[in-house]
Amino acid sequence: MITDEIRERLLALRDVKYRDFQIKLIPGKTAEDSIGVRTPELRKLAKEFAKRDDIGDFLNDLPHKFFDEDQIHAFIISEIKDYKTCMAEVCRFLPYVDNWATCDQMSPKVFKKHREALAIQADKWLDSPDTYTIRFGIKMLMEHFLDGDFDTKYPERISGLRSAEYYVNMMIAWYFATALAKQWDAVIPYIENKRLDIWTHNKAIQKSIESYRITPEQKAYLRTLKIKK
């Protein structure tokens, strides 16, 4: 089976020191469910196995046993060239994504050519009860709709989200920090008017101040907008 073949290849690339370092950064992951394969090697394997006629057997074999298998799954999905097929695989995989790393590594190339359909699906993801599905939806709006396809309806939608989940709120902060760098005039009112919860508001400001894309003048102004607890 292709799943066994992929697992054997991953185990052959095991780096125990890297695994032990990595699991400290990813809550919930342990030495028992992580192999320790470095990202460049995972990407190489993903490109290789994505060409296989039987790759669907691996993509259907959910949930996976190892974190590294989730990672290679995300990279394989990112290589799918047909939009409908790719979107179907993303939607099937997202409920099994249980960590920020797998969520953030998944970035299908084909989405760039289908932004209208992507925007509709991203809006649905934001209504999900699953932490990493919401995070992925925000990430897609950040990656694809802050430049030429920007519309204020996107920050408006995201500013209305409320969650007790750290990894949702951190992505909201990341979104607004990136949005301030790319669409300052349209997005700064969300900070001025305190449209986010206090923690996310202050985190968005912090991340903006840390960004080289924000001017010194903008950073100075943002400092005046911090909410003191």
Give residue spans per PLM region.
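Alpha-helical scaffold domains
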Residues: 1-229
